[in-house]
């Protein structure tokens, strides 16, 4: 929640490739001076599909989607903010459903004298309550992330770096079929193993109401680019715009030559619409 705002609401829409879309609604309430509560609802729709029988004959339609409801609590102590989210996640494919109970925990440190922020998060700690088949349960997508952002003094730039999947040192995937990656080296270099954990970002602060952003995801580029036409896979760009109390965020992320995804977010402080009347003025 942006500083100085007490009842913040935000809506996000992501236009992925094909018919896949992701919607998120978030509401954050400042309970006391140093704490806040948050409620979130997320819906990821994968589209509609044609169902076929064993002989390949059409047998109707089905859809697939993921849902998640989250409750978050955050508390600020001096220069540290600690928080945790409890999430109920449901995944549905046709008549099959899986349910999981998850939690995210993390902390943020803000330097008292510099524009420096460091964050650590443990995401998707939990247990699958119900599997698609009702038999063996799948592990949750656990992820440990460490992030840092820094704005040098007197410079209109902010730099950020995020390390993900720290619980798994080697996340390099090599295609050994000899078809899709005919010219790919089957040797793993230490530099590549480290780089695939990192996401780099830069932000040009043109004013308090307009920022331009650029990002690079090395893992995404290495896994999704075409060898003969890598293009802009792994790169992203966007902007932040503030207009009359509303904050608009837009980003375009390039995954593959086949297309890119668009991310839209609009947020505002509801308190500005329900300001209490000053008794002295009546």
What spans do the regions from the language model cover?
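Subset of outer-membrane beta-barrel
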Residues: 1-282
